[in-house]
């Protein structure tokens, strides 16, 4: 039997008794990073006085999926008590476990997903922004045109948007939002359920000022409210050119939505 097991996103007390029971019985653990999972098991054994001791560990991530499924004996997923554990939170949400779900479905392997901690739902509940519909984008592309387009799509969404972001890029994300829509309401939370959990909610411009004087360490979850203009359409280069703004500022805005070099755009505008 194959179980998909959610792990705490910070606070060990958030793991359920059912998850602990399955962990104690499991023979095989599949996970993204075996070091992270082994460390978690050590902590759980110490905290709850357990004897979690799976016989085998296997790593499954985006770089070894094909090799893993080519070599792993699928019969063992049916005859052994197997667990797929995420590094933190719910499996298969911005997580390579999704490929194992598909594999189980394609091969008629029974599986069960246990309930547990989930960072995006915690952020949704804490935001005061989301009531029903929302869009979850996971992690955005890191650089260039793809990232600029992804941010613009998020701002043009008909629904509030939830994004995962790293401490290295959280400031640039809020800066990009403030440049396109300074008054857009944004909620952000880091280190959720941990000792140094921190939450902020403000307009994008004011939030940027707050963050410039804050400790940015930790993984962030960002909730962007939908635009106050429900009929908002995608901003185009033509829209920006029609604005009463200095050419340098126009060049920067065009760069944000196209991913092209701002200096090159500016040179084209003045020639």
UniProtKB/Swiss-Prot annotation:
SS bond list: none
E.C. designation(s): 2.1.1.198
An example Gene Ontology molecular-function term: rRNA (cytosine-2'-O-)-methyltransferase activity
GO cellular component, one term: cytoplasm
Keyword annotations: Cytoplasm, Methyltransferase, rRNA processing, S-adenosyl-L-methionine, Transferase
Subcellular location(s) per record: Cytoplasm
Domain of life of the source: Bacteria
Catalyzed reaction equations: cytidine(1402) in 16S rRNA + S-adenosyl-L-methionine = 2'-O-methylcytidine(1402) in 16S rRNA + S-adenosyl-L-homocysteine + H(+)
Family: Belongs to the methyltransferase superfamily. RsmI family.
Matches recorded under HAMAP family: 16SrRNA_methyltr_I
PANTHER family attached to this UniProt entry: RIBOSOMAL RNA SMALL SUBUNIT METHYLTRANSFERASE I
Alphabetical list of NCBIfam families matching this protein: 16S rRNA (cytidine(1402)-2'-O)-methyltransferase
Function field: Catalyzes the 2'-O-methylation of the ribose of cytidine 1402 (C1402) in 16S rRNA.
Name used for this protein in its record: Ribosomal RNA small subunit methyltransferase I
UniProt organism field: Campylobacter fetus subsp. fetus (strain 82-40)
């Amino acid at each position: 039997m194959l179980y998909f097991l959610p792990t705490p996103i910070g606070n060990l007390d958030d793991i359920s008794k059912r998850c602990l029971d399955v962990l104690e019985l499991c023979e095989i653990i599949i996970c993204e990073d075996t070091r992270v999972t082994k460390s978690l098991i050590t902590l759980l054994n110490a905290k709850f006085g357990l004897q979690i001791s799976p016989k085998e560990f296997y790593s499954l991530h985006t770089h070894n999926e094909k090799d893993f499924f080519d070599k792993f004996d699928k019969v063992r997923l049916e005859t052994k008590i197997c667990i797929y554990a995420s590094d933190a939170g719910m499996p298969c949400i911005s997580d390579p476990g999704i490929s194992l779900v598909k594999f189980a479905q394609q091969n008629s392997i029974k599986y069960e997903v246990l309930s547990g901690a989930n960072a995006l739902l915690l952020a949704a509940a804490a935001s005061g922004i989301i009531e029903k519909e929302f869009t979850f984008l996971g992690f955005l592309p890191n650089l260039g045109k793809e990232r600029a387009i992804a941010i613009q799509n998020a701002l043009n969404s008909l629904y509030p948007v939830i994004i995962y972001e790293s401490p290295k890029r959280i400031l640039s994300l809020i800066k990009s939002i403030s440049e396109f829509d300074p008054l857009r309401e944004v909620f952000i939370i880091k280190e959720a359920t941990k000792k140094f959990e921190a939450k902020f909610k403000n307009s994008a411009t004011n939030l940027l000022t707050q963050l410039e004087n804050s400790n940015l360490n930790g993984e962030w979850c960002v909730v962007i409210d939908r635009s106050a203009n429900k009929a908002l359409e995608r901003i185009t280069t033509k829209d920006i050119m029609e604005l009463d703004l200095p050419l340098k500022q126009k060049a920067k805005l065009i760069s944000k939505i196209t991913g092209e070099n701002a200096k090159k755009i500016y040179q084209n505008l003045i020639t």
